Amino acid sequence: MCAGTMKIISPSLTNSFFRCTLRFVACLFWIGYSQGTTHVLRFGGIFESVESGPSGAEELAFRFAVNTINRNRTLLPNTTITYDTQRINLYDSFEASRKACEQLSLGVAAIFGPSHSSSANAVQSICNALGVPHIQTRWKHQVSDNKDSFYVSLYPDFSSLSRAILDLVQFFKWKTVTIAYDDSTGLIRLQELIKAPSRYNLRLKIRQLPIDTKDAKPLLKEMKRGKEFHVIFDCSHDMAAGILKQALAMGMMTEYYHYIFTTLDLFALDVEPYRYSGVNMTGFRILNIENSQVLSIIEKWSMERLQAPPKPDSGLLDGFMTTDAALMYDAVHVASVAVQQFPQMTVSSLQCNRHKPWRFGARFINLIKEAHWEGLTGRITFNKTNGLRTDFDLDVISLKEEGLEKIGTWDPTSGLNMTDNQKGKPANITDSLSNRSLIVTTILEEPYVMFKKSDKPLYGKARFEGYCIDLLEKLSRILGFEYEVRLVEDGKYGAKDDSTQQWNGMVRELMDHKADLAVAPLAITYVREQVIDFTKPFMTLGIGILYRKPNGTNPGVFSFLNPLSPDIWMYILLAYLGVSCVLFVIARFSPYEWYNPHPCNPDSDVVENNFTLLNSFWFGVGALMQQGSELMPKALSTRIVGGIWWFFTLIIISSYTANLAAFLTVERMESPIDSADDLAKQTKIEYGAVQDGATMTFFKKSRIPTYEKMWAFMNSRSQSVLVKNNEEGIQRALTSDYAFLMESTTIEFVTQRNCNLTQIGGLIDSKGYGVGTPMGSPYRDKITIAILQLQEEGVLHMMKEKWWRGNGCPEEESKEASALGVQNIGGIFIVLAAGLVLSVFVAVGEFLYKSKKNAQLEKRSFCSAMVEELRMSLKCQRRLKHKPQPPVIVKTEEVINMHTFNDRRLPGKETMA
């Protein structure tokens, strides 16, 4: 029948059947050829989920990466990647091991995931045994003797990331840091930071976040109570999102708090509610969003991700690519780069119970470790020994009003490089203060802060006026902030109680963040700088002594002696005695001071000297009293003495006369104290300061003996000498024998308006008033710049003139004249002494010269003539002496005549030939 059938078939039908058969065989051949040239590899992925539901970001990124590689065909033109994904419960290591064995039995070139350590370690041990690469995108603790040779991790090495956090802490100059971690591995990850206190001046406090719940409010409450403003949170992004929401509800999202998050997903969090809170929030980002190709891939991812159901309460922006997703995307591409280098690689089914490793596994893992790829997270290279990613770039991001912005970079080689100040837009000091409302604490103190006098009721800041109020208004105009003025509750400036170690006053309110600024006469001191910050001083001053003015005393009966000091009076008396004696001696020695008392008888051999001892004293008195004495010196030496004495008396009398009028007309103000030393040496006059003020603290902390003694006095009588405020101290200084220690600027203000008070002595110390801010306040530097601007423009000086200038007290006609001392007119005594010495030398010269002339005249030796002259000069009571005569020749008749006329003396006219 068959043959018959064959026979009845026509040739045309036979040819058609033959052609169809050939075509069918050709198709089968092409399919077989195609299957032989197209390489197919399978990747396995194990992902964790809390419960059955939508796929997580890592699983979606894994599929997205595989599909992208297969679509583009650029990386693997002749290889098709397939995948097998499995889901397990969190921390289920047994289920993870079972799923890994299932995938290995199917034949996979590598296994990606799971994320958590316990499950990852179980899968890692299986991969090590069977020689299959295990690729991780989460941090896993690596022990020093790590033997996971088939392991690579794309997550940045946390020892490097810990150094990045430490560099950031040092850049911000933090002194106290709190670390809050969510599991025990956080202490391992942050080991570089935990070791920091031993190497840096850093105080570290470590707290653990709640494990079984996301309620962090109890922990945040403890941080707020402990004033922990610098906190590092080591937690997942969903935990970070919950912490931010709870911190906002607790009032911990202010400019005084600064948070650093270790999660690399900070950029993906919804920070819209916190943009204008003023909180400082810093973190790191590894996703290279500045690359246009990366942005293109993220856009495609976002489009596909938005089609998937969003994960509830994740805290992430919908469709935003997380770091885990980006790392998984890069991990698939890195494995594909290794596949490209090993095209002949094939996979085989592996059984967990046989322990027969994959023959291509060792080479494949080495190719993965040697791979280089510029991915979504930057450059990717591995340490060939441990498979860790140690070379990477991080962007430092910070919360601004525009959102999270890049402010710097960090890499393991160069470290931290902050670029926030190098942006295109210029820095503006009003950026952090514009349109903000600040609480300002102050204290009533004239003329700084006072209640404004008005007939109408005043409210708010309009109730106050004064220097500090004007300063606050100027600052608000420059910086653009609003403010509310509140008086400090306890009425104190701020001091530390030694027994309780607690602060009070305005300092306490700043420490408790009840106020943003303290604008008052608040002195900048060392102890206050330990707990709060200060701006540069807007006023410099010191501690002075306020005391009532002493009563004036009328000039006394003997006030005419006051123009010259007692020393000068004594020196004048000694000078008078000395000059008189010198004049007497010189007049006796000088031959030219002897004269003929009978001018009509020029032949008389008797000469006379007017300068007896009494006459010499009389001559000195006459010159001193500006009167004549009828005694005129004739010799040059005596005239020198007289002239120099007259010059001396001229200066003395002129000085005395000039100073006498002041002493006779001015009421002398005699004060019992003139300085702090005078106060310390006595106990009759009480003295004190404002309790718990900067002045009291100065004496309390001083180590200068005088001030220590003063503090001992004040401390022993603290109930009576320490006052509550300046007004009480001023009133006590007016009404009792009390010296009030206070700031010099306030003393200046008080003495301008109360003429019965005055400042005693100079300043005891030097300090300044500054605007106080809480520790670490971002406003301090901005306010400092504004204060310097006001200072340079002269505004601060004009404000001081406005509030300090009063009616003024009537000026005294003249100040008390001080007695002239040796330093004033001592030179005239030197001139007097020089004149006396000169006159002595001249007198000696005259004496020698005259002795020589007499020796020649009397024809005898020079020595005998000098002795004779000296003998006659030393006869102090004699005014007469014989003139020297030449020898004469006497004739006989003249002798007879002499006997006859015995009442006449020898004329002695003839001389020997």
UniProtKB/Swiss-Prot annotation:
InterPro entries on file: ANF_lig-bd_rcpt, Glu/Gly-bd, Iono_Glu_rcpt_met, Ionotropic_Glu_rcpt, Iontro_rcpt_C, Peripla_BP_I
Recorded name of the encoding gene: grik2
UniProt keyword terms in alphabetical order: Cell membrane, Disulfide bond, Glycoprotein, Ion channel, Ion transport, Ligand-gated ion channel, Membrane, Postsynaptic cell membrane, Receptor, Synapse, Transmembrane, Transmembrane helix, Transport
Catalytic activity of the protein: Ca(2+)(in) = Ca(2+)(out); Na(+)(in) = Na(+)(out)
Lineage, opening ranks: Eukaryota, Metazoa, Chordata, Craniata, Vertebrata
Keyword Lyase part of the UniProt annotation: no
Single Gene Ontology BP annotation: modulation of chemical synaptic transmission
Transmembrane segments: 567-587, 644-664, 825-845
Membrane topology: Multi-pass membrane protein
UniProt subcellular location: Cell membrane; Postsynaptic cell membrane
Similarity section: Belongs to the glutamate-gated ion channel (TC 1.A.10.1) family. GRIK2 subfamily.
Role according to the record: Ionotropic glutamate receptor that functions as a cation-permeable ligand-gated ion channel, gated by L-glutamate and the glutamatergic agonist kainic acid. L-glutamate acts as an excitatory neurotransmitter at many synapses in the central nervous system. Binding of the excitatory neurotransmitter L-glutamate induces a conformation change, leading to the opening of the cation channel, and thereby converts the chemical signal to an electrical impulse. The receptor then desensitizes rapidly and enters a transient inactive state, characterized by the presence of bound agonist.
Annotated PANTHER family: IONOTROPIC GLUTAMATE RECEPTOR (PTHR18966)
Residues carrying a glycan: N72, N78, N280, N383, N417, N428, N435, N551, N756
All ranges on the Cytoplasmic side of the membrane: 588-643, 846-913
Activity regulation comment: Cold receptor activity activated by temperatures between 10-19 degrees Celsius.
Residues engaged in binding L-glutamate: P521, A523, R528, A694, T695, E743
Description of how the protein assembles with itself and partners: Homotetramer and heterotetramer with GRIK5. Tetramers may be formed by the dimerization of dimers.
A GO cellular-component term linked to this record: postsynaptic density membrane
One term of GO molecular function: kainate selective glutamate receptor activity
Extracellular side: 1-566, 665-824
UniProt keyword annotation of Repeat present: no
Family matches, as SMART domains: Lig_chan-Glu_bd (SM00918), PBPe (SM00079)
Residue pairs linked by disulfide bridges in the UniProt entry: C101-C352, C755-C809
Protein known as: Glutamate receptor ionotropic, kainate 2
